[in-house]
Amino acid sequence: MFRQWLTLVIIVLVYIPVAIDATVLHVAAPTLSMTLGASGNELLWIIDIYSLVMAGMVLPMGALGDRIGFKRLLMLGGTLFGLASLAAAFSHTASWLIATRVLLAIGAAMIVPATLAGIRATFCEEKHRNMALGVWAAVGSGGAAFGPLIGGILLEHFYWGSVFLINVPIVLVVMGLTARYVPRQAGRRDQPLNLGHAVMLIIAILLLVYSAKTALKGHLSLWVISFTLLTGALLLGLFIRTQLATSRPMIDMRLFTHRIILSGVVMAMTAMITLVGFELLMAQELQFVHGLSPYEAGVFMLPVMVASGFSGPIAGVLVSRLGLRLVATGGMALSALSFYGLAMTDFSTQQWQAWGLMALLGFSAASALLASTSAIMAAAPAEKAAAAGAIETMAYELGAGLGIAIFGLLLSRSFSASIRLPAGLEAQEIARASSSMGEAVQLANSLPPTQGQAILDAARHAFIWSHSVALSSAGSMLLLLAVGMWFSLAKAQRR
């Protein structure tokens, strides 16, 4: 019994930095922009590449664990995660940091299925296994929720690379404990890896996201954007066709023909897009516009984190009493109303109103997330429960990556359209200041004080307006989705 719970402690320890790294850079965005000279586009890639790559790699890494055993996979993933953290901490350019974040994502994609497989292999009794899974889930949601606060504390007192360096001692301790105490398991050599399918999916996702970002930025010619978009769409279509044709697919695409499962996947992605995208937007506004430190920004956003953490048990009861359809659509509708309210809130003078709306957003979005889990797990056939769970995991990670991309694009587009810069700037300076808030601040710091202050004032006014546009747009999309989900789930329940 002692060895079982020691294994759980080891699993939880290694999972903590994986969960935190998904959100820890949200409050670090302004710091990275200034320190590395990252453009707005580079900043989005630094943050969202982690979730996008992890979404495509988590399933084949799970298959690799079946082949070599979860202990070896945990050792391999932990080692890669630790080395990538060390490399990321001493990045001197945005491109290098993006590359190390890719390696971090691959390491994390090994760790997540290894920890779940470890729990299944270690806890034979259902009661103990469910308890262990509950601890694992709490650590995952808690780590992601408090990532911005932890990042803020570290940035307040240490070098920005400390948000990555903190992973290294944790990994070293876990690797030592794993080697000494975790038993080795026999692998199944016949398990297919589907690495080619995973690479195809990741490239398709990255090409589609890249084409969307560059189209709205207007940095490339129309034919280059069209070619990138078409290539991504063709690769995605080829991936789907391959999954349907093979006898042992990476993703069981036939599960998407079930209306409730499809609705659950959409809800999971939407909830993650909402929470992650909002955190990134808020972190930038609080620091760039209102002058808060990273730590103060993390504290200001606590209502979202706390409310989302406490929503689980309450939302579970609500699903049982009110039904999946009402909780799911109600959660999205309340999230939309929260966005509308926050779009009209002045964060410098209406803090209590902002905190109340953020708490409502955290609770409602997390409730929709729990409803999505209930929908997927309840609708999936027993023999396909693992495949359904894998799809849900991918939806979470993909939603996190898309949340950063979507909110970043909305913010960037409205910022560029609304900024009114002072006269006397060269064309290159105008293009740079109009690109993003971070680049406007970089330019202002390089110019004489009077001219720099005029640019800062213009950028802050534009960012506040852009914040309202982005939140209102997101609220409208959520409201339309809630209406669509209401009718979709009604049709599914009548079948």
Curated annotation (Swiss-Prot):
It holds the Pfam family MFS_1. It is found in: Cell inner membrane. Keywords: Cell inner membrane, Cell membrane, Membrane, Transmembrane, Transmembrane helix, Transport. PROSITE patterns: MFS (PS50850). Gene3D superfamilies: MFS general substrate transporter like domains, Multidrug resistance protein D. GO terms for molecular function: transmembrane transporter activity. The chain crosses the membrane at residues 5-25, 44-64, 73-93, 96-116, 135-155, 158-178, 192-212, 220-240, 260-280, 299-319, 327-347, 357-377, 391-411, 469-489. It is a multi-pass membrane protein. GO terms for cellular component: membrane; plasma membrane. NCBIfam families: PRK14995.1. Major efflux pump for acriflavine and other quaternary ammonium compounds (QACs). Also required for resistance to methyl viologen. Belongs to the major facilitator superfamily. TCR/Tet family. This is Methyl viologen resistance protein SmvA.
